[in-house]
Regions:
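Short, Lys/Arg-enriched N-terminal segment that forms or immediately precedes the first helix
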Residues: 2-14
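Short, hydrophobic-biased segments on the C-terminal half of alpha helices
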Residues: 60-61
Length: 73
């Protein structure tokens, strides 16, 4: 998905399309494994040095609450 497609998806789900949420969603969309929050953080921090683990956890929670992703138990 493109940046604008992801932004539209987030907005249509009632979320603000922040760069953090877009990056996390894009990562999950392109990596069809079941990564941990730490794996997502490790992959994105080089590209987005201002990201923190808290940012990743909050983005994941927002995406789950909007039913855009599902947790794996």
């Amino acid at each position: 998905m493109t940046f604008s497609e992801i932004a539209g998806l987030l907005k249509s789900s009632g979320l603000r399309a922040t760069p953090q949420r877009i990056a996390v969603y894009e990562y999950l969309d392109t990596h069809r494994t079941h990564p941990t929050a730490d794996e997502i953080f490790a992959s994105l921090v080089a590209q987005y040095p201002s990201f923190s683990r808290t940012t990743i956890y909050n983005s994941i929670r927002a995406l789950e609450d909007a039913a855009l992703i599902q947790p794996v138990m």
